């Protein structure tokens, strides 16, 4: 009887001492799993925060890159200067071509400097004949009104004519060739110059006849 009681007590002590380390181990394992779960959660939140930061930096870089192509005041000034340079270059080329065309033209002994209309089919023209400048009335007939003899006045008239010719920009040559308008003045110039020469010859004859009559009248 006593032996059975001792045996039962021994078994109880054995069970108690054997269960305690198992429970401690289980508790330790439970504590380790909880710690690992918290660590994993912290790492996950840290990764999510880093991803959010990277996204925000990317969006900021993209917005800065999109805002970069905006035109500044310096770019606007450069564009204006480039446009002015192109305009000046075109003007210089056109002026040079006009000057070259005038140099290639044959020398004209008789040249129309300019004129103005004074009525229907009537006008007053300035004609350059050699180094002389004549004021001619053109109507049904051609009459010599005046011969400009002042050298300073002649220089002023010719210089103004040259400036007007040099500053004149013939844009029509770059658009289309006006063949008809180029041929018509060439057809009219011979008849006009011929009539002018005849008028000048008649004027010379009248002057020479007047000089001859003068001495006879004195005799």
Swiss-Prot record:
What name does the UniProt record give this protein? Flagellar biosynthetic protein FliZ
Note the NCBIfam families from the entry.
PRK13415.1
Q: Where is this region: Disordered?
A: 41-62, 200-219
List the transmembrane segments.
71-96
Q: Which InterPro entries match?
A: Flagellar_biosynth_FliO
Q: Which gene encodes it?
A: fliZ
Instruction: Give a short account of what the protein does.
Output: May be a structural component of the flagellum that anchors the rod to the membrane.
> Which residue windows does the record flag with biased composition (Basic and acidic residues)?
41-61, 200-212
Record keyword Membrane present: yes
Keyword vocabulary terms for this entry: Bacterial flagellum biogenesis, Cell membrane, Membrane, Signal, Transmembrane, Transmembrane helix
Is-annotated flag, keyword Zinc-finger? no
Against Pfam families, the record matches this protein to: FliO (PF04347)
Task: Tell me the compartments it is located in.
Answer: Cell membrane
Q: Name one GO biological process term.
A: bacterial-type flagellum organization
Kindly give the membrane topology term recorded for this protein: Single-pass membrane protein
- Signal peptide limits: 1-26
Give the CC-aspect GO terms: plasma membrane
